[in-house]
């Protein structure tokens, strides 16, 4: 008799040409992810060849009950690390039956910005550092922390090793490999300053692909924590007190910044970002005011400062960039629960399209 694990790992390619496509979309909170699967007659590699689909938006907080149908438009395809074979994950965005993007569809506007000829010509690159916290399921307390208590002070946990310093590495490494299998441009992982908190990086990726990849990487991570019986949190300040929050630092460059003389282009871009600081803060994640306090490697959200190698700044420029006179900069303001479609497109819009 087959066990459940045998059936979960069943290789369908031995017996059928049909494949499973898992359609993924952003739910009603703008942060939660939803998915459902359908059978296709054969392998598909081009998202334009995939059928549109619908779902009950009244059950996700995205449509009223009397007119509940929301339409999914397939946008990008990734290999499915759970079902494997020719099975796929499909990142979608959501529209009304009339073809209008619903309010939580932030991809639609981002695609407009990234298709602007001025933006296309500059080939914007993004590298996003996604921090997250793993919580014990029944008590909503970080993994590795004593129930009702606290671990030792921060210091030994960042990039730490050992059973008393690194908690949840099996989840982290499983996620790393699953993203590589899926075709996501994941570039690394590390343990973070607060115990039970980790980070993965996506990029450098061009334009809207950075946000597509980050959303699917988040999806894969939550599926893995589901299997492990652990809760995934993107709260920007999951534990109050003398503990680091969780961000999504966004590294950015354009072709002009990467070419000779790019440091001057970077400084002009930072000046633009300073002038729109309030607008960016408002769009950079819910609850970010609990994180951006001027402590724990953050700048106060009410002030804008930038500097070279300054992790207490709003915008950090690396020493390598300063020395080379070209390169990239890091926007340290986005919270861990930010929408990458919003953040990446807003940075491009402010630095490339906005005229002060």
UniProtKB/Swiss-Prot annotation:
Tissue specificity of this protein: This is a nodule isozyme.
GO biological process, one term: glutamine biosynthetic process
Keyword tags: ATP-binding, Cytoplasm, Ligase, Nitrogen fixation, Nucleotide-binding
UniProt KW NAD keyword: no
EC numbers for this chain: 6.3.1.2
GO molecular function per UniProt: ATP binding; glutamine synthetase activity
Places the protein is found: Cytoplasm
Pfam families, alphabetized: Gln-synt_C, Gln-synt_N
Official protein name in the record: Glutamine synthetase N-1
Organism for this UniProt entry: Phaseolus vulgaris
């Amino acid at each position: 008799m087959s066990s459940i694990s045998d059936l979960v790992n069943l290789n369908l390619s031995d017996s059928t040409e049909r494949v499973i496509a898992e359609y993924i979309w952003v739910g009603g909170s703008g942060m939660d992810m939803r998915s459902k699967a359908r059978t296709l007659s054969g392998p598909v590699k081009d998202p334009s060849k995939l059928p549109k689909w619908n779902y009950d938006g009244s059950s996700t907080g995205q449509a009223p009950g009397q007119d509940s149908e929301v339409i999914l438009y397939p946008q990008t395809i990734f290999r499915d690390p759970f079902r494997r074979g020719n099975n796929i994950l499909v990142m979608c965005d959501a529209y009304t039956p009339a073809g209008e993007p619903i309010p939580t569809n932030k991809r639609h506007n981002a695609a407009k910005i990234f298709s602007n000829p001025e933006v296309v010509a500059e080939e914007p690159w993004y590298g996003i550092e996604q921090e997250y916290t793993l919580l014990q399921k029944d008590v909503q307390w970080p993994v590795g922390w004593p129930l009702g208590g606290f671990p030792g002070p921060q210091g030994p946990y960042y990039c730490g090793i050992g059973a008393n310093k690194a908690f949840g590495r099996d989840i982290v490494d499983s996620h790393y490999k699953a993203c590589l299998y899926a075709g996501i441009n994941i570039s690394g992982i590390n343990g973070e300053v607060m115990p039970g908190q980790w980070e993965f990086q996506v990029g450098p990726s061009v334009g809207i692909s950075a946000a597509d990849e980050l959303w699917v990487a988040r999806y894969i991570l939550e599926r893995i924590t589901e299997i492990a019986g652990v809760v995934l949190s993107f709260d920007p300040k999951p534990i109050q007190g003398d503990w680091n929050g969780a961000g999504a630092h966004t590294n950015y460059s354009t072709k002009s910044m990467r070419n000779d003389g790019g440091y001057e282009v970077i400084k002009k871009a930072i000046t633009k970002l300073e002038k729109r600081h309030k607008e960016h803060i408002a769009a950079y994640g819910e609850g970010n005011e609990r994180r951006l306090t001027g402590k724990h490697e953050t700048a106060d959200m009410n002030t804008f400062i930038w500097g070279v190698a300054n992790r207490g700044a709003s915008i950090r420029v690396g020493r390598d960039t300063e020395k080379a006179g070209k390169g990239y900069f890091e926007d340290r303001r986005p919270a861990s629960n930010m929408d990458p479609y919003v953040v990446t497109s807003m940075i491009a819009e402010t630095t490339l399209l906005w005229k002060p």
